[in-house]
């Protein structure tokens, strides 16, 4: 793998540095929305923690000078009274103790509020990510670049907003301290401030450059990171572990996992060694400048220009000032890095969303049913000229009370047609009508209420049995009567009632006391889920009985025909025993409808359908 692209050599390390801070304001706004009182508390504690160190240094000077004066007074007094001599100094010591206590209280307040905000903000950002996911189209989810964006956002962005805010308040605290220290240092010499800045600036420039390098590396290798996560899932999930063990894949996948880690670790190690080496070398400059100033203050004190207390104060102020400035510049560099990572979050949140402009709840021609008019579909991306459509020039009409069966090889476009019907995809060309109105003009909610679908790759929710049914109609999610009714239609009620907790039984192995079902039982659960929508007049079954035995399959379709008598029924199946009773059969090959008609008519035509039917029938002889 080639190294990540670097910035142009002509650009400076700080090129575009401050431009990236556009996300700081949004992060602060996010924290304000999460808890304005905690943010105000952070501001107050920051102010206290920023001002009081300089006050403590000034009081420290007064204590040292007070001790020197008390010693001289006590030594020169004719009738020395120790209590009288030390009382003013002890008051100053008590005052400094109070200041230190307030600083400790402010620091504890900062720590407590940051800890609480971390939990609140992490939850808020994760909810934002998941809410955004709910607005994205299926086509966007099938885009690997969006998955990379989502992976980057979820890995870092939930912690970065608070980190950015903490650094912002830390910067404010250090800036206040620096201002306070600056007032004291200027009394010594304005050059002292210049020395302070000059000592910390090289480290800041270095950190800014390496923060940008780390971020570019992070973005560039998202696919490798996603592969690591995928391999972890495959090796540790019950739905994949059977094949992993049977095929002996542990060693193969673990080695691939290790290889990816080794590659990523080597990149991290190179960057870390360069970053820390330069940080050490440039940090030595700061140390040298500090001790140069240290010597300067000592010389001035020996020369009599400064008192012992002033020397103590200036040394303390210079040391704390250097630490505060270094922390400030490091915070700015860290804020830069946090802003870079937050760009992942906002790039994801700003993904364009297909406008839901449809408002219709009733079509222009009620009862007309479904119409596909010259519908073609190509997946987005790639060369639109060279890319073959997945579906090409599909036209059909299905009236209420009619059934349609789709027949064809795997990958012929059958399931894609269903995704177009349910508006998971939009046609590239042509249009789909429901009751005489374009599908895009319908309200999404109204369309969902009219459609009951079971896909071949249905979801096996690690929830209770009843909840697995309830997801079919969220308005009746907790309605036990509706669960039972749907389960009877889907032939799941028999085995559900035999379970220990009935409809309250936990399914799957992810949670305690969960029960796993057979493939056929899961299909009955999914079928029952499709029947949850009482008002659905479009029923779609995509290979609904692939894991069922012949007797169960026959009963399922007998009930399906009864249930869908006055509805529009669409069935995808490779079993001709189930499709032969459909009012209309479409044979699809490579996205084209090559044959259409009833079972008898297609047999008379003696085309592809007849050939496939005879092949399957031969297997039963």
Name every feature range the model reports, one short phrase each:
Residues 1-53, 70-92, 106, 110-114, ...:
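Membrane-integrated ABC transporters
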Residues 133, 257, 372-374:
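Conserved catalytic Walker-motif region of ABC-type ATPase nucleotide-binding domains
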Residues 112-134, 138, 196-236, 255, ...:
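Cytoplasmic coupling helices
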Residues 33, 154-164, 217, 223, ...:
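An intracellular "coupling" helix at the cytosolic face of ABC transporter transmembrane type-1 domains
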Residues 138, 351-354, 492-496:
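Hydrophobic patch in the ABC ATPase nucleotide-binding domain
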Residues 39-109, 181-214, 288-295, 299-308, ...:
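Transmembrane helix-loop-helix hairpins at lipid-water interfaces of multipass membrane proteins
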Residues 220, 249, 273, 293, ...:
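Cytosolic ends of transmembrane helices, especially the final helix of ABC transmembrane type-1 domains
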Residues 358, 363-621:
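ABC-type nucleotide-binding domain
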């Amino acid at each position: 793998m080639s190294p990540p692209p670097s910035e142009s050599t002509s650009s400076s390390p700080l090129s575009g540095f401050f431009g990236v801070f556009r996300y700081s304001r949004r992060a602060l706004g996010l924290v304000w929305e999460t808890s304005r009182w905690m943010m105000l508390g952070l501001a107050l504690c920051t102010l206290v923690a920023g001002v009081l160190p300089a006050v403590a240094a000034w009081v420290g000077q007064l204590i040292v000078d007070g001790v020197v004066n008390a010693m001289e007074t006590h030594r020169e007094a004719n009738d020395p009274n120790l209590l009288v001599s030390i009382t003013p100094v002890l008051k100053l010591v008590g005052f400094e103790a109070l200041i230190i206590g307030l600083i400790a209280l402010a620091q504890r307040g900062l720590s407590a509020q940051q800890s609480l905000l971390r939990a609140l903000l992490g939850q808020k950002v994760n909810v934002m990510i998941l809410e955004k996911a709910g607005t994205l189209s299926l086509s966007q989810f099938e885009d690997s670049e969006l998955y990379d964006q989502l992976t980057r956002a979820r890995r870092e962005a939930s912690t970065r907003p608070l980190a950015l805010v903490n650094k912002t308040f830390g910067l404010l605290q250090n800036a206040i301290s620096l201002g306070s220290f600056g007032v004291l240092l200027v009394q010594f010499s304005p050059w002292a401030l210049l020395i302070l800045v000059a000592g910390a600036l090289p480290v800041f420039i270095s950190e800014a450059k390496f923060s940008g390098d780390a971020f570019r590396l992070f973005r560039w290798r998202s696919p490798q990171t996603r592969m690591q996560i995928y391999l972890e899932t495959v090796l540790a999930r019950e739905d994949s572990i059977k094949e992993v063990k049977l095929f002996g894949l542990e060693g193969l996948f673990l080695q691939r996992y290790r290889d990816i880690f080794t590659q990523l670790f080597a990149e991290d190690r190179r960057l870390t060694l360069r970053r820390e080496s330069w940080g050490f070398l440039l940090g030595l400059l700061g140390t040298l400048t500090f001790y140069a100033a240290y010597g300067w203050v000592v010389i001035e004190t020996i020369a009599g220009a400064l008192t012992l207390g002033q020397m103590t104060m200036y040394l303390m102020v210079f040391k704390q000032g250097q630490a505060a400035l270094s922390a400030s510049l490091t915070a700015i560099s860290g804020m830069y890095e946090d802003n870079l990572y937050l760009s992942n979050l906002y790039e994801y949140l700003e993904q364009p969303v297909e406008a839901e402009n449809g408002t219709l709840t009733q079509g222009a021609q009620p009862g007309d049913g479904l119409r596909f008019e010259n519908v073609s579909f190509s997946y987005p991306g790639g060369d639109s000229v060279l890319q073959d459509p997945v579906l090409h020039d599909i036209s059909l009409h299905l009236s209420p009370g009619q059934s349609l069966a789709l027949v064809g090889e795997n990958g012929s476009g059958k399931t894609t047609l269903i995704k177009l019907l349910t508006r998971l995809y939009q046609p590239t060309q042509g249009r789909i009508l429901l009751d005489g109105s374009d599908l895009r003009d319908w309200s999404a909610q109204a369309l969902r209420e009219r459609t009951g679908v079971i896909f071949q790759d249905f979801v096996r929710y690690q929830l209770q049995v009843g909840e697995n049914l309830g997801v079919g109609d969220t308005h009746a999610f907790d309605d036990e009567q509706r669960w039972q009714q749907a389960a009877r239609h889907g032939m799941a009620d028999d085995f559900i009632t035999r379970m220990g907790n009935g409809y309250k039984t936990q399914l799957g192995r992810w949670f305690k006391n969960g029960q796993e079902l057979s493939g056929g039982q899961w299909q009955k659960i999914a079928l029952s889920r499709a029947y949850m929508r009482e008002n659905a007049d479009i029923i779609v079954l995509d290979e609904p009985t692939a894991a069922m035995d012949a007797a169960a399959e026959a009963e399922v379709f007998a009930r399906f025909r009864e249930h869908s008598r006055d509805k529009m029924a669409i069935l995808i199946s490779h079993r001709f025993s189930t499709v032969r009773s459909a009012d209309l059969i479409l044979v699809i090959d490579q996205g084209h409808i090559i044959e259409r008609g009833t079972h008898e008519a297609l047999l008379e035509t003696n085309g592809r359908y007849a050939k496939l039917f005879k092949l399957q029938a031969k297997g039963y002889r």
